[in-house]
């Protein structure tokens, strides 16, 4: 536990499910004030809010589409209005879907890029704007992926969004380091989340993925949440501009680096 996270205001996009929800609960355990952004499932968001509160934190939910500039502006401003400030912005919302690249429509490409990359930029921009204007040494955490460095056949749009996120994060970190604002990525590997539930329910597919992970198992959302808590804490005060991979060593596995998966 990180005592300095108590009462910190943390915004999490896509915070009602999967990795986002696990992070929300972890910050609840840290007694933080959590702003849970969700896209369209209010019931799921309310469940996440309850879980955060039961863990020891405070929480509100805010509906919004991260591809819409006005929604992201509203999200950040709502956090500030409700809790008085902003300390940590976690850009977690993301989508993926497999399509052969020669069949990928522009609409599909744009949906993934707009959600994963543009949405993260908008969240970063609005948070940093507030930090700069109020002389706050704030923290931005972007949810990247092992695929910011590993090519992924059938997911060219997703890989492009995460590759772009890598350099976006590094650039923002360099630009705002003199102001004490830290910007980092988390790069999860294979995770037991709802987006992967169908795939990992198939024993053969699950075993195939596990065979590419040196640690031998698919990660738990709580393991990514622990990384987020560390990066948000003062224990990481000298850490900026990096991607911290939580992947069980997947990025070091030769056959996966060759494009398998």
Swiss-Prot record:
Binding locations of NADP(+): 11-35
Catalytic reactions on record: D-glucose + NAD(+) = D-glucono-1,5-lactone + NADH + H(+); D-glucose + NADP(+) = D-glucono-1,5-lactone + NADPH + H(+)
Keyword field contains Cytoplasm: no
UniProt-listed InterPro entries: NAD(P)-bd_dom_sf, Sc_DH/Rdtase_CS, SDR_fam
Enzyme class, broadest EC rank: oxidoreductase
EC number(s) given by UniProt: 1.1.1.47
Active site: 158 (proton acceptor)
Residues holding substrate: 145
Keywords, ordered alphabetically: NADP, Oxidoreductase
GO MF entry, a single one: glucose 1-dehydrogenase (NAD+) activity
SUPFAM superfamilies noted in UniProt: NAD(P)-binding Rossmann-fold domains (SSF51735)
Homology family: Belongs to the short-chain dehydrogenases/reductases (SDR) family.
Oligomeric and partner information: Homotetramer.
Protein name listed in UniProt: Glucose 1-dehydrogenase A
Organism from which the protein derives: Priestia megaterium
Gene from which this protein is expressed: gdhA
